[in-house]
């Protein structure tokens, strides 16, 4: 009887201790509903700046989340933001339907949008939706399914591609393009 009581006490002690401990390798998950961030139901792209602030391309615009507060930054056209990329200079580049540019903080620490679309001289937009943004060879690259746009910090050059880029992937300093009905290509200067 004493042994049974001792075993029962030991078992009870260990089981109560194990309930209070966390499960190893179990990620902490926090869900955010549409009512938390007060924007569209679809999120298309996510990136994070060097301060830890998250930027999310959303149906209603660019969402900014500092870990506590959400803020929506709409494009002048109020279009969906499909792609988001943060440049080395801290600019937040965004892509949308026949629109692309960047948000930059002003002297009041508010985000202000600067369109780059009209900087693409001699380029006619035709259903160009910017799906991916990355950097290559010192330029920001905006990718739609029929065009690539290169921004060097001053000018924008738009080109129609012979093969249609489905997506861009960056590995180190090399940018790869998966082509629609094609193979994998390397974006060269």
Locate each region found by the language model.
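Carboxylate-rich, polar loop motifs that coordinate divalent cations or form catalytic acidic clusters
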Residues: 1-189
